[in-house]
Amino acid sequence: HMKKMGMEFNLECPVQAVEASPVGAKVVCKNKAGETVSFEAEKVLVAIGRKANTASLNLEAAGLNNDRGRIIVNDKMETNVPGVYAIGDCVFGKAQLAHTASAMGEVAAENIMGIPAVYDEKTNPTCVYMEPEAASVGLTEEQCKAKGIDYKVGKFPLVANGKSLIINGGEGLVKIIADAKYEEVLGMHIIGPRATDLIAEGALALRLEA
């Protein structure tokens, strides 16, 4: 969809520098082949996530293991210091999303109260609020291959869905990844209208091991 709009995608292309140019700005990158390439544009949007707001906490003095200020926790949201828990954007290696922090908070609170609970990352969806919307939960094909999982894929084009056509949103698809033998849902990926709402069904299927 975005390629049709004239957008160009360059993945695995780390930025080396951003410089002023007659057009506006020039971004210098290194591509997968190790070659230096550059792109010019009027504006550059930098979207690299948030920096953990932990500088004032003196993590080292508290003995908390961290990676550049992001606190390392286990699946119970507990740090290496017994009784100390961390959740949200200050946690290392987790998605910086509000619903992710909420799920972490529930797990931490239950463990603090003595109720065993673990954070299940695979049932926590990721949503991209754009046009068209995109959403994902569970494993991708690449992750299944890396884990050696025998899987199968089902795809449904939204152009075949009446409700999508009614709202002029026929462009998009739903992709489901399932275990090849037992047909348990391993992942769901959607692009199209209301994808960020529909992904909840995929998260439910994963949580119920359907």
Show which residues each predicted segment covers:
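Helical element adjacent to the flavin cofactor pocket in flavoenzyme catalytic cores
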Residues: 1-9
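Flexible, glycine-rich terminal cap/loop adjacent to redox cofactors
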Residues: 113, 130-210
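A conserved short coil-to-beta-strand element within the FAD-binding core of flavoproteins
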Residues: 11-23
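A conserved FAD-binding loop/helix module that cradles the flavin
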Residues: 1, 87-145
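A short alpha-helix-loop-beta-strand transition element characteristic
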Residues: 65-68, 115-125, 149-154
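FAD-site-proximal beta/loop scaffold in flavoenzymes
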Residues: 9, 38-113
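Short, acidic, Ser/Thr-enriched surface-loop or helix-capping motifs
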Residues: 31, 74-75, 179-180
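Conserved beta-strand-loop-beta-strand element in the redox core of flavoprotein oxidoreductases
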Residues: 20-38, 44
